[in-house]
């Protein structure tokens, strides 16, 4: 499983030009058992044994990848983090914790992370309702076998008070280069925060928004139905999608030379560089992805770029090379992989991009002479 890309990365979902993925996660705990952070090793192991067999028996988990955290190499754990299949916190766990992932990598269940169970469904594009439908089905199936901690007044009980209630965290990963280049992103983040939603970086809380990638999610779950949370978040994301498209078109109409220059420079550096730090690679790939969305590159090359966002991450580089690499070695290998992938990648077709924008320019950037 670790050698193949997840189905959600194929970029085939609704609004895939802006929404990379949608994820819905449910947190559950067993009644009258200590939370993982408070439980001793023997109790965590007992809880794991109680839960794991039921998870593996799910029809959706036929031929699943199922491993105890103590049996996974540190590198494999980090690969799972980079694919958003486990959290950074779960990767730090050992005996008494496990992960079960379906072969399509659209369903992931962490056992004994912060809670006894963290079930998540990932979909390409804006598909929060579909992601919730699957994880809700899994939750119902497991609840018929396990006694979950539930309070009639509060809802599902969780280790973190902010998850008490539905135990649900819904989020979408958005690619927002237009808003960043237009210097409007801070306004959007402030507006989103004021209505009770959280904005985080590439790998969640406390991480940087590299590659112009932002996670938007609900912050609290108490006193609100799952469907209401999903609907409210979906509407906000649809508004952000509109603002991102508006920002891209405004850049194309008012600052075409700047936009063409950014895309050309990104293509040039990625095509010829021999050392490439992770952050720089993500930021440049983001510009190429923007160029593709605007028509500068053929659509049939999209998967190649989307896969590079994952394949050039530190653990994936070491996994593919089958050796441990220091930061400098990773930078050289990252640049080599990008150069090799872009050998058959066409040069940016600026005239096509401008024509598709419908702003009347047909011969590339205006002359400065």
Locate the predicted segments by residue:
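Conserved phosphate/anionic-ligand binding catalytic regions in large, soluble enzymes, centered on
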Residues: 155-174
